[in-house]
């Protein structure tokens, strides 16, 4: 398997220097936080600037949305909102549904799987290359991952100093 070195960036990183990351740190792509649903529906305050900086330095990019859906109806609202943020922009990497936190604790396995599928189906029908971000243990124990294999997987391995 070919490994590439990428980063995820949100407002938490502040005024991030993508050109330096690409030219001096070996970063090959960035996945930018577009928004989330964990505090009402919102757009990440740095999204537009982060997107622009990636374009300016030629860094390939994708985007992600931090989910908080408690039902299929919520997931559909989150997907439509995500589409509104992404509209008019180009992505070389998938757009991801970030599945962690309260989505895991507030939903049973079958419900969470249906929520994730609903979100991804809407994104895919809008023409996006869609993926799911979660930890390996969440993919294995909190979702019916066999029903989600058609979507790209970005597997979190928190606490590692280097990708494995």
Question: How would you name each of these model-derived features?
Answer:
Residues 1-35:
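Boundary/entry segment of secreted carbohydrate-active catalytic domains
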Residues 5-9, 28-32, 61-65, 95-97, ...:
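Hydrophobic faces of well-ordered beta-strands that scaffold small-molecule active sites
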Residues 7, 21-22, 54, 97, ...:
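Conserved, mostly hydrophobic/aromatic
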Residues 11-15, 35-41, 67-72, 101-104, ...:
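Solvent-exposed loop/turn segments at secondary-structure junctions
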Residues 16-26, 46-59, 82-91:
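Acidic (Asp/Glu)-rich catalytic clusters
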Residues 24-27, 80-95, 102-164:
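Surface-exposed substrate-engagement region within the catalytic domains
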Residues 43-46, 69-83:
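Glycine-rich anion/phosphate-binding loops
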Residues 57-73, 89-106:
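Metal-dependent polysaccharide deacetylase catalytic core of the NodB/CE4 family, i.e.
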């Amino acid at each position: 398997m070919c490994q590439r070195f990428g980063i995820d960036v949100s407002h938490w990183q502040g005024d991030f220097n993508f050109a330096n990351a690409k030219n001096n740190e070996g970063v090959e792509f960035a996945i930018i936080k577009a928004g989330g649903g964990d505090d009402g529906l919102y757009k990440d305050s740095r999204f537009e600037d982060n997107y622009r900086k990636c374009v300016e330095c030629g860094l390939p990019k994708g985007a992600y949305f931090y989910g908080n859906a408690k039902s299929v109806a919520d997931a559909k609202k989150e997907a439509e909102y995500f589409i509104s943020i992404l509209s008019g922009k180009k992505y070389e990497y998938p757009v991801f549904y970030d599945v962690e936190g309260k989505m895991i604790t507030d939903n049973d396995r079958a419900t969470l799987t249906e929520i994730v599928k609903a979100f991804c189906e809407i994104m895919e029908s809008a023409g996006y290359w869609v993926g799911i971000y979660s930890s390996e243990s969440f993919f294995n124990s909190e979702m019916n991952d066999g029903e989600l294999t058609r979507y790209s997987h970005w597997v979190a391995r928190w606490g590692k100093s280097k990708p494995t």
